[in-house]
Amino acid sequence: MLPHGLIVSCQALPDEPLHSSFIMSKMALAAYEGGAVGIRANTKEDILAIKETVDLPVIGIVKRDYDYSDVFITATSKEVDELIESQCEVIALDATLQQRPKETLDELVSYIRTHAPNVEIMADIATVEEAKNAARLGFDYIGTTLHGYTSYTQGQLLYQNDFQFLKDVLQSVDAKVIAEGNVITPDMYKRVMDLGVHCSVVGGAITRPKEITKRFVQVMED
């Protein structure tokens, strides 16, 4: 089980300056030394490098685009197999109700339970309906990761209306809830923890210096 506290997302996509398994392992080490209780990471290669560097539980994902589907976070059993090989403690996958490129969500959950019975599963959702569906399927964790990042929730921010969406999710499911997406200040982190989430994933505000720099520059441009 993931501990209560701060999970730091250590990810850099191929078009980003810090794209490197070695660099992500050092990001994870910095997060560990700062007090993080877990890491969220993308790709088998990054996860293996991180697990060689820090003794923390890892939420693993594989981001891969597929034609004719907007699902890109651990979309098929191919990505699941890569994550099983990485020996991450938690496999996270898109648990929205969008059309998937291959297996159904139910099939993927069954696949993970069969092939990796000791691995926990996290649902990345965008709506309360999707949270309820993930709970029905038996996900161990339900994360607000994709709220604001789907075509039907675009423009919505997790912290709007004092985290009302997060409150709605907490009231709708019994599974452990993870706050993720636009938790960008220590005060926001404290607020979501006070609301009763199991843990919170913070990425961009800690491990993406390019995006952090942009926010400083844009303050003056605006």
UniProtKB/Swiss-Prot annotation:
Q: Tell me the protein's name.
A: Putative N-acetylmannosamine-6-phosphate 2-epimerase
Q: In which pathway does it act?
A: Amino-sugar metabolism; N-acetylneuraminate degradation; D-fructose 6-phosphate from N-acetylneuraminate: step 3/5
Isomerase: present as a keyword of the record?
yes
Sorted UniProt keywords: Carbohydrate metabolism, Isomerase
Q: Which NCBIfam families match?
A: PRK01130.1
Return any one Pfam family short name. Answer: NanE
Q: Which Gene3D superfamilies match?
A: Aldolase class I
GO biological-process terms attached to the record? carbohydrate metabolic process; N-acetylmannosamine catabolic process; N-acetylneuraminate catabolic process
